[in-house]
Design a protein with these regions (language model features):
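Active-site-flanking beta-strand signature of metal-NTP-handling nucleotidyl enzymes
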Residues: 2-8
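Short, surface-exposed ligand-recognition loops at beta-strand->loop->(often short) alpha-helix junctions
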Residues: 9-20
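Short coil/turn motifs at secondary-structure junctions
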Residues: 11-13, 41-43, 55-57, 94
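Glycine-rich beta-strand-turn "strand-cap" elements at beta-sheet edges
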Residues: 2, 35-49, 72-96
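An amphipathic, aromatic/His-enriched active-site/gating alpha helix that lines ligand/cofactor pockets
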Residues: 24-35, 53-87
Length: 96
């Protein structure tokens, strides 16, 4: 499995819109996607972390390079102060 962790700072007052966008994105049938988790930080309610897990690095890269994902990214950016900080890598342990 392979995926990304994104650190995001949401614009003031846009927290609900951001979550709606994230939920809409979650409902799209993205090939190879295994799981999506969104965390809202206790220390700062405008700071979110999103983890996205794919079956493989190839599935992740295919999604990242797709025009559909680019459109979802642009929609998400309407609620964010700046671009997310991305951390990509292999899943080396999971227990669900």
């Amino acid at each position: 499995m392979y995926g990304t962790i994104a650190k995001m700072r949401v614009k003031a007052g846009m927290e609900q819109q951001f979550l709606q966008i994230a939920e809409t994105t979650e409902s799209v049938n993205v090939p190879g996607i295994v799981a999506v988790y969104v965390y809202q930080m206790d220390a700062n309610s405008r700071e979110f972390y999103m983890t996205v897990v794919f079956e493989s690095k190839e599935a992740y890269v295919a999604n990242a390079n797709s025009p559909e994902q680019h459109q979802r990214f642009l929609q998400m950016m309407t609620a964010l102060e700046t671009e997310p900080e991305w951390h990509d890598g292999a899943v080396v342990f999971a227990n669900a």
